[in-house]
């Protein structure tokens, strides 16, 4: 059987947090695209991640990761556009953009994970900023 060792790129459960400033979303997406080529070619059937159980459906899991990242990026992009339309608060400092994006995009996620979500949002904002 063709097993792909993915380390932390693809996990046995959940998804990887690409945390700014060390995590580079461009490099991460490029890695996922390379994994996608390997799984689509049939050279890898299952995944042995650095954490969690073996993943029997390598191709489906990599597709899920890519789709999840695309969805999150679109959610972050939409949140930024919405936030740009909001007026400046009267008499107060405007909160950090990343915090405000987290409140919108990760509203359904327990607040305990918001610090990690914030680092992920910072990586996504950096990525979107480089795209222009």
Which residues fall in each region the model found?
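Metallo-beta-lactamase
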Residues: 1-79
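C-terminal regulatory/interaction regions
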Residues: 79-132
């Amino acid at each position: 059987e063709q097993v792909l060792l993915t380390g932390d790129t693809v996990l046995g459960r959940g998804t990887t947090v690409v945390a700014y400033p060390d995590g580079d979303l461009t490099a991460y997406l490029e890695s996922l695209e390379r994994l996608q080529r390997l799984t689509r070619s049939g050279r890898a059937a299952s995944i042995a991640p650095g954490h969690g159980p073996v993943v029997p459906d390598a191709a489906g899991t990599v597709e899920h990761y890519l789709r999840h990242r695309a969805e999150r990026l679109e959610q972050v992009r939409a949140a930024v556009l919405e936030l740009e339309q909001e007026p400046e608060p009267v008499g107060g400092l405007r909160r950090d953009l990343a915090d405000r994006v987290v409140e919108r995009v990760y509203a359904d996620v327990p607040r305990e994970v918001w610090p990690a979500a914030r680092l992920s949002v910072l990586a996504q904002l950096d990525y979107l900023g480089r795209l222009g």
